[in-house]
Amino acid sequence: MQTIAEILSKELNETLPHVQNVIELLDGGNTVPFIARYRKEMHGSMDDQQIRKLADRLTYLRNLDARRSEIKQSIASQEKLTGELSAKLDGAATLAELEDLYRPYKPKRTTRASIAKEKGLMPLAAKLLLQEPAADPVKLAEKYVNPGKGVNTPDEALSGARDIIAERLSDSADIRRYIKELAHRSGAITASRAADAPEDNGVYDMYFDFSEGLSTIPGYRVLAINRGEKEGFLKVSVNIPEEGAERIVALSVVRGSCPCSKQVEAAAKDAWSRLIYPSVTRELRSMLTDEACEQAIATFAVNLKPLLMQPPVKGMVTMGLDPGYRTGCKVAVVDETGKVLDTAVIYPAPPHNKIAEAERIVTGLIKKHNVKVISIGNGTAGRETEKFAADTVKGTDVKYVIVSEAGASVYSASKLGAEEFPDYDVSLRSAVSIARRLQDPLAELVKIDPKSIGVGQYQHDMPQKRLDETLEGVVEDCVNSVGVDLNTASVSLLSHVSGINSTVAKNIVAYREAEGAFRSRKELLKVPKLGAKAYEQCAGFLRVPESAEMLDNTAVHPESYRAAKSLLLLCGSDISKLPDELKRIGMDKAAEECGIGVPTLKDIIRELQKPGRDPRDELPKPLLRSDVMEMSDLVPGMELTGTVRNIVDFGAFVDIGVHQDGLVHISRICDKFIRHPSEVLKPGDIVTVWVLEVDQKKKRISLTMKKER
């Protein structure tokens, strides 16, 4: 039997020592960002996503082993654990396979078969299974008639014996495996309109007469069908070829055509229709749902990461507009660091239409604070607010950007929002958040539950614990990839740093408020509850620009300061000479002299050449706009530049500046075949698109990224 490390090595195509090292590091309480960044020599430079995948599979395989042990103990206690069965259990690669093998030995609630066994009909079932040509089933059954046990006639005895045979067939791991293989090859999931379905608004139209193969149906359709069934619109079933399934069951047990064989054949048909079909279809649907959820969670993660990693718009005084109709549009002006300078409420949209007054207020704030860019939320009244802003800044150098306001209202009404802005109305907090989202998306978005950011499909239908764990991993990876300024970071941002929990994050901020700015990374050890292990995990991801130690403002870990200083000595503290010096002595020799591995050496060189490097600066900046377009302005063939807002399994939604995102179907993203849009696109990408079709009535815009030739 393979060890877990050997299984993972084969699955992930990583060397066994590297896998063993990662397992040891994880078991030692090291975080994924720390392992990925500062232990590269131990795992061959696996990235954070690869390590998380390994950690996920490690948990699954350990749970599998634990369940295997439980099952073996249970069967052994029944004195039924044979060498052959033990080997089969050892060979089971999934929990489903394990449970199928355990079915015959699993304690059951009362069933028709268990009642028949209590009536003493097991020997009759065994005799029927012998299928002796000369045997008469009725005469065999007469011996088991016992009114005292509730067996009044030979027919009742035969019925009970068939129930025992049917359950035995239903519990066969081999039969269940063959049926599932048949279902995967030839089965389909079907949906139709439920008899008592409520009035439909068109959402489930395509599923009222629907059938698709189990092996080909995409995950998003599985989740849509599940939701339609849950809401009472759809009746859903799994179709498995009945003739083929019955043949599989019968061939496993029926021999010949004697009278006893007819009884066994009847039991086989009953096993299929009454026991195997309902059970297997439940399993198949559960499996489809699990796979669909994993795919949807992965898509959510793919969308979330680039949203968090959007390049900040630095060094600009920013105005945030939170649009609204009746309650007005909330305005907040923040300086280059995100500090609130001014707030106001304007009413440019219906029913008030106080456009002139709103223009006067906004123009005054722009001049007073030298506002350079306006950040506009894309929610209710966003269209009218965008037009108002475009008209107001026309002829000036002020630009505007539409930002997603998803989650802003959640933050503004949260305990965190109240603590940060106790004197501001909830709606004004939203305007501040919208302004800050443009200045530093990561620092602002970490204050919000990732599920509220609005980039997932069917997120409420997914296992919430699994979704939370995955999204938290994405947030953690992003925060640690960028690094955090120890003297300006909020509790929310600090709590996502490797090795720091919310309690320690609060203690860091409390220490900062009491003692003033941190003057070095080493000072972190004075923070209550931040011990040596936490310091090891977090220090490299925290920056202290004010420190006398230059390396404290880089991603170089304190454990590598001596190596970094040895490197500086090599080039006489002139970083520009370092490449020539390294070429002269060689990377391997330099690493050896510094007492580190080559991967760590390369990371240190990168940091010394660009101290304070922000990986977000290398990504495309948000599109700044100065005018507005209407949907009616669009015509087929028109070329536009847009921003990818969201990735879904069937395509990508692109903001082209008309307040209604257009859809680029997966087939129109590129010329080569792709399985998923995320292979070539991510949220935040700036793309060139062409208009294919505009449906004003349904508010739908179809786009293509493939220029028509």
Question: Model-found features: residue ranges?
Answer:
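Short, ordered loop/turn segments at secondary-structure junctions
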Residues: 38-40, 129, 241, 323, ...
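Duplex nucleic acid-engaging cores and interfaces of nucleic-acid transaction enzymes
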Residues: 47-53, 60, 64-320, 324-424, ...
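Long, highly charged, low-complexity intrinsically disordered interaction regions
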Residues: 4, 56, 62-80, 90, ...
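Structured, non-catalytic alpha/beta "coupling" segments that mediate domain-domain communication
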Residues: 74, 99-102, 228-241, 251-276, ...
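A glycine-rich phosphate-binding loop feature that marks nucleotide/adenosyl-phosphate handling sites
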Residues: 181-188, 321-325, 379-384, 403-410, ...
